C-alpha cells in the first residue's frame, strides 16, 4: 500500500517522471516561464525552487548537485552567477503559478509557471 506517498505520480514511471521534471526545470530556468498542466507545474515548482536555493548557496558541492540535475552546463553557471543578486532577499517562493484556460482536446487544467 502507498500510505502517505508524497511524490506526485503524473501518470508516468519514476524514470520518465524524473526526466520530464529535469527537462521542464531546465526550460523554466532558461525561458523564465513554461505553460504546462497544473499538476506538472506544482511538481516543477519544488524542483525549481530547490535548484535556485542551491544556486543561492553557491558552494562547489551545490554547483555539482545542480550540474547533475540541470541538462545545460552554461545555464547552471548563469544561474549561479545571477541567483544571489536576483533572489538574495527572498527566502523561498521563487516561482508563481497562474491558472489558465483548460487545454482543448482533453480539458486538462493548464497553468503558467514563471520565475518571480
Curated annotation (Swiss-Prot):
Pfam families: Ribosomal_L17
Record InterPro entries: Ribosomal_bL17, Ribosomal_bL17_sf
Entry's Gene Ontology cellular component terms: cytosolic large ribosomal subunit
UniProt key word Ribonucleoprotein: yes
Keywords: Ribonucleoprotein, Ribosomal protein
MF annotations from Gene Ontology: structural constituent of ribosome
GO terms for biological process, alphabetical: translation
Complex and partners: Part of the 50S ribosomal subunit. Contacts protein L32.
Entries under NCBIfam families matching the protein: L17 (TIGR00059)
Record family assignment: Belongs to the bacterial ribosomal protein bL17 family.
HAMAP family reported in the protein's UniProt record: Ribosomal_bL17
Protein name stated in the entry: Large ribosomal subunit protein bL17
Species this chain originates from: Synechococcus sp. (strain RCC307)
Gene behind the chain: rplQ
Amino acid at each position: 500500500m502507498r500510505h502517505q506517498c508524497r511524490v506526485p505520480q503524473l501518470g508516468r514511471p519514476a524514470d520518465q517522471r524524473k526526466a520530464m521534471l529535469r527537462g521542464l526545470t531546465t526550460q523554466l530556468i532558461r525561458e523564465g516561464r513554461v505553460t504546462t498542466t497544473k499538476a506538472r507545474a506544482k511538481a516543477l515548482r519544488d524542483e525549481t525552487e530547490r535548484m535556485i536555493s542551491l544556486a543561492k548557496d553557491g558552494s562547489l558541492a551545490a554547483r555539482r548537485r545542480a550540474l547533475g540535475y540541470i541538462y545545460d552546463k552554461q545555464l547552471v553557471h548563469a544561474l549561479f552567477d545571477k541567483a544571489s543578486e536576483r533572489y538574495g532577499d527572498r527566502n523561498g517562493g521563487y516561482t508563481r503559478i497562474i491558472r489558465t484556460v483548460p487545454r482543448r482536446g482533453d480539458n486538462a487544467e493548464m497553468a503558467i509557471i514563471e520565475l518571480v
